[in-house]
Amino acid sequence: SVMSASPGPDLAGRGYSEHEYAASGIARRFVETPDGGLDGVDTAPFTTRILVRRPDAAQFNGHVLVEWFNVSSGADSAPEYTYVAEELIRSGTAYVGISAQYTGVAGGRDSVDLETTGAGTAGVQGDSLEGKDPERYAGMQHPGDAYSYDMFGSIITALRNTTGEPSPLA
């Protein structure tokens, strides 16, 4: 699951399905060159989670909104989806959320210093995928945030691929 500011619409009741997939590949880590460009200095394997919410094929308008999950709380959250869910469903747009950052996958310190003892926040801080369900997410492998940009881009490229491997959007 993904944290949200509101419970969101009834996906099944509106002709949508929600599925999780593991996305794997090789990501590059970039450093800035003296002339302001980027240089891919090394690579590392990754396996992360993507969350796909899609309409029935007859409703699909061909558009996909992709969101980089926010991890400021120490867990994946989908702030953009919270605000646009109704419009996505109305228009027949698919949604893909990507666990792009290390904290969301493997855990770490939150950046907003949430209290974990207050009402409504218990269990929020540090609820990474591996922390929530170690068995389910045992195959996740995140090389670190320096690789996140290429992971995100690689997953989007794979989603756009209409040949070869089956797409989670199909």
Residue ranges and their predicted role:
Residues 1-82, 89:
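Catalytic-loop region of hydrolases
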Residues 63, 94-95:
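Structural motif
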Residues 9, 50, 137, 169-170:
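Generic preference for hydrophobic/aromatic residues in regular secondary structure cores
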Residues 71-73, 89, 95-169:
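Cap/lid segment of the alpha/beta-hydrolase catalytic domain
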